[in-house]
Amino acid sequence: MFNETVKEIHIEPTSVCNAECPMCARNINGKGLNPYITLKSLPVKWFKDNITPTQIKQLNKIFFCGNVGDPASAPELIQIAQYFKEHNPDIIVGLNSNGGLKTKDWWKKLGEVLQGPLDYCVFSIDGLEDTNHIYRRNVKWDKIIQNVVSFISTGARAHWDMLVFEHNKHQVDEAKDLAKEMGFSWFRAKETDRWDTYTSNLGILPANEYSSRTYTKDITCEKDRDNSIFLDYTGKYWPCCHMAE
């Protein structure tokens, strides 16, 4: 699957996460690990053994995200990013994280690696100190702020991605102002469309009345659009993350 046409890899480096978000596939409605998940992280050795320098040189971008883990949980995430940068200094490296993992020193080291003009980290922060934990369960606000400040201090680009619910919709403007004050380069507020998936009480409500979407048959496949593939935490390649869920 990883052939000469591939230009982008979406990498899930781990299945480990500190949070228990109600709508995440790793949890049973936010109340415990799904039994199909094995807690595992890919080491840098796996990448050195399975992705050659020649293959790295053909890539335009990699980004660490996935379906069930937070990339910052991966013990060797920085070393993995360095391996790609070593063999392709121009490659774009990005990741998504809730920001509540590791130490501020770790985040500073990561920021020092992600120094490309288009490198980035998306921090998923769903509100402010009194609301973020309602959805991002087990994620500590003070920890997020310390880590974000440390990351941004290196000059690395940080993005703030906010899921909007009934309990935090009044804070969107304040969060946007805080993002600007802290030095985030980008802020986005969005609503989730996962309500159709859950029938039990999750302890959260949509920001606005939700109605099921009507989907068309005309789908733009991101694999074809981006010449991309997905690598899961077991070391298996998929056409995209949606097929791996």
What are these regions (language model features)?
Residues 67, 98-100, 126-128, 163-165, ...:
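Active-site beta-loop-alpha junctions enriched in small/polar residues
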Residues 102-104, 169-172, 238:
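Short, well-ordered alpha-helical microsegments
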Residues 1-12, 185-245:
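Accessory C-terminal segments flanking Radical SAM cores
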Residues 115-129, 186-193:
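Non-cysteine beta-strand/loop elements that form the S-adenosyl-L-methionine
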Residues 94-96, 122, 159, 187-188:
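Structural detector of well-ordered beta-strand residues that form the stable sheet scaffold
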Residues 1-120, 134-142, 146:
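Conserved alpha-helical substructure of the radical SAM core
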Residues 93, 148-171:
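Conserved strand-turn element in the central/C-terminal portion of the radical SAM core barrel
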Residues 80-85, 169-188:
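Short, electropositive alpha-helical surface patch
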